[in-house]
Swiss-Prot record:
<keyword id="KW-0663">Pyridoxal phosphate</keyword>
<keyword id="KW-0554">One-carbon metabolism</keyword>
<feature type="binding site">
    <location>
        <position position="121"/>
    </location>
    <ligand>
        <name>(6S)-5,6,7,8-tetrahydrofolate</name>
    </ligand>
</feature>
<keyword id="KW-0808">Transferase</keyword>
<dbReference type="GO" id="GO:0004372">
    <property type="term" value="F:glycine hydroxymethyltransferase activity"/>
</dbReference>
<dbReference type="GO" id="GO:0030170">
    <property type="term" value="F:pyridoxal phosphate binding"/>
</dbReference>
<comment type="pathway">
    <text>One-carbon metabolism; tetrahydrofolate interconversion.</text>
</comment>
<comment type="subunit">
    <text>Homodimer.</text>
</comment>
<dbReference type="GO" id="GO:0035999">
    <property type="term" value="P:tetrahydrofolate interconversion"/>
</dbReference>
<comment type="similarity">
    <text>Belongs to the SHMT family.</text>
</comment>
<dbReference type="InterPro" id="IPR049943">
    <property type="entry name" value="Ser_HO-MeTrfase-like"/>
</dbReference>
<protein>
    <recommendedName>
        <fullName>Serine hydroxymethyltransferase</fullName>
        <ecNumber>2.1.2.1</ecNumber>
    </recommendedName>
</protein>
<comment type="function">
    <text>Catalyzes the reversible interconversion of serine and glycine with tetrahydrofolate (THF) serving as the one-carbon carrier. This reaction serves as the major source of one-carbon groups required for the biosynthesis of purines, thymidylate, methionine, and other important biomolecules. Also exhibits THF-independent aldolase activity toward beta-hydroxyamino acids, producing glycine and aldehydes, via a retro-aldol mechanism.</text>
</comment>
<dbReference type="InterPro" id="IPR039429">
    <property type="entry name" value="SHMT-like_dom"/>
</dbReference>
<comment type="pathway">
    <text>Amino-acid biosynthesis; glycine biosynthesis; glycine from L-serine: step 1/1.</text>
</comment>
<feature type="binding site">
    <location>
        <begin position="125"/>
        <end position="127"/>
    </location>
    <ligand>
        <name>(6S)-5,6,7,8-tetrahydrofolate</name>
    </ligand>
</feature>
<feature type="binding site">
    <location>
        <begin position="355"/>
        <end position="357"/>
    </location>
    <ligand>
        <name>(6S)-5,6,7,8-tetrahydrofolate</name>
    </ligand>
</feature>
Length: 417
């Protein structure tokens, strides 16, 4: 018999110490990595539930194992909420990650060797959109599209590439692009050559759910997302579609199970259901509106302090600082800010002269700081501290002074009260 009072602290002190240290790190550091966020205690409650014990290969009502009557309810709730939230008529909530969801879409729609048009990783795309080190770049013929001199997606070049190479699929979406994507324009380009339009909205799903960013679901043949990032749920993936055929939906389901995965993670699917319900609440819309406001407020400070922001601003939750003119590398900036308990990630910028392991920029996102209660006043102050460090990157006294301010503001705005 298993006793409910069993705990990690008494059994595995070494592991528990690391877990506790991570808890402290999250409370005492300001998180500005654009893909990170803080999930709710309700989501964590679902992830730590007895649902983790249940195998449920298949889909609701069509399982290979018995005893699935209650996990069927859980998964159907997640499916229905995903469809309602994003205006879809198909949803698959089983992918273990965004990359797994993307893999399933490739599997359902393409054959190895097919041509795909995807955003250049060096100009804002994602590994799974055709990077040569990823399955997408290894299995498919990838043609990259990019941005113009203003830092915006070059739709004219995209259309030209599509006409020339006749890809079977065009991918929309990004990991480091601060603009609004014209989904309708992308669908027009896809339709002109008879290609699928597949959108990976992982970074902006929360903004889309709140109506702060345009929804690709009405325009794309298939859409994927993660359920964390701006959506603030558990780590996992999701596939959506609207107006497609039952044949397409069957292909997508089969590409997830049994092609890519076995049993779904029912405790994570329950957590997805919780997060999707939370995303329907009025306060979630208020939160996402503040995410966008905070990103713009930070950009304003950096521009006023003489820093170059790729594309000159942001229309979502993230932006890139181009440090070439400051003679700084992203690696140096990342490390110096980290010593002040400010967490960012080094990131390549357009026409970056440095390697991806060094880079000439950093990516900054506002979802996590907004989640802990920061508004314009706080993020402007924060951006100013960051400029102080970047202006004096080798001055440890400046870094220590900023670190003290970071610890103070983190204490005033705890992640979990």
């Amino acid at each position: 018999m298993l006793k409910r009072e069993m705990n990690i602290a008494d059994y595995d002190a070494e592991l528990w110490q690391a877990m506790e240290q991570e808890k402290v790190r999250q409370e005492e550091h300001i998180e500005l990595i654009a893909s990170e966020n803080y999930t709710s205690p309700r989501v964590m409650q679902a992830q730590g539930s007895q649902l983790t014990n249940k195998y449920a290969e298949g889909y609701p009502g069509k399982r290979y194992y018995g005893g699935c009557e209650y996990v069927d309810i859980v998964e159907q709730l997640a499916i229905d909420r995903a469809k309602e939230l994003f205006g879809a008529d198909y949803a698959n909530v089983q992918p273990h990650s965004g990359s797994q969801a993307n893999f399933a879409v490739y599997t359902a729609l393409l054959q190895p060797g097919d041509t795909v048009l995807g955003m250049n990783l060096a100009q804002g795309g994602h590994l799974t959109h055709g990077s040569p080190v990823n399955f997408s770049g290894k299995l498919y013929n990838i043609i990259p599209y990019g941005i113009d001199e203003s830092g915006k997606i070059d739709y004219e070049d995209m259309a030209k590439q599509a006409k020339e190479h006749k890809p079977k699929m065009i991918i929309g979406g990004f990991s480091a692009y601060s603009g609004i994507v014209d989904w309708a324009k992308m669908r027009e380009i896809a339709d002109s050559i008879g290609a699928y339009l597949f959108v990976d909205m992982a970074h902006v799903a929360g903004l889309i759910a709140a109506g702060v960013y345009p929804n690709p679901v009405p325009h794309a043949h298939v859409v994927t997302t993660t359920t964390h990032k701006t959506l603030a749920g558990p780590r996992g993936g999701l596939i959506l579609a609207k107006g497609g055929s039952e044949e397409l939906y069957k292909k997508l389901n089969s590409a997830v199970f049994p092609s890519a995965q076995g049993g779904p993670l029912m405790h994570v699917i329950a957590a997805k259901a919780v997060a999707l319900k939370e995303a329907m609440e009025p306060e979630f819309k208020t939160y996402q509106q503040q995410v966008a406001k905070n990103a713009k407020a930070m950009v304003e400070v950096f521009l006023n302090r003489g820093y170059k922001v790729v594309s000159g601003g942001t229309e979502n939750h993230l932006f890139l600082l181009d440090l070439v003119d400051k003679n700084l590398t992203g690696k140096e900036a990342d490390a110096a800010l980290g010593r002040a308990n400010i967490t960012v990630n080094k990131n390549s910028v357009p026409n970056d002269p440095k390697s991806p392991f060094v880079t000439s920029g950093i990516r900054i996102g506002s979802p996590a700081v907004t989640r802990r209660g920061f508004k314009e006043a706080e993020v402007k102050e924060l951006a100013g501290w960051m400029c102080d460090i970047l202006d004096n990157i080798n001055d440890e006294a400046v870094i220590e002074r900023v670190k003290g301010k970071v610890l103070d503001i983190c204490a005033r705005f705890p992640v979990y009260a």
